[in-house]
Amino acid sequence: VALLAAEVSGYRDRRATPRFAHEAGAALLLFEQLHDVRLHARHGRFYFPEDEMHRFGTHPGDLLAAQTTDRVRQLFAFQAERIQEYHRRALDYLPDVDRLDQCSLLVRLELAMALLTEIAEDGYRLLEHRISLTPLRKLWLAWRRRRGERRRFRRLPARE
């Protein structure tokens, strides 16, 4: 989906920006799987790799529990680190010349990372309750990201 969004938004750097979109898409997909883990588990969908669940001493049934155990919390923290790594790589790939064009994807990443921070600060208690950002906070984050990208774009050297 992120690759399609990048194509629709347009870009100049044919090598780096598709890589950005790939990494951003992976970050967003993994984030969605973590954020909605309780909902997915209730529908019999378990997206975490078996070897990683085994590594933390967990199994799919643990994701159906009403309480987040320490082991499950560690698994969630590990997944969050992976998401953050994809996010960092995505931003590293995105060239300045394409940042404004890719602003919608940057906003989606911004919102996901803000929510991931909230999840971490809550102790990864994703099995107990759903964590979300208020609409006003979402608006603020999106506006701030868009404004920052417009300012950055204006500072770029003249384009031909």
What spans do the regions from the language model cover?
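Catalytic cores of Mg2+-dependent Asp-rich isoprenoid enzymes
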Residues: A2-L28, L34, R38-E160
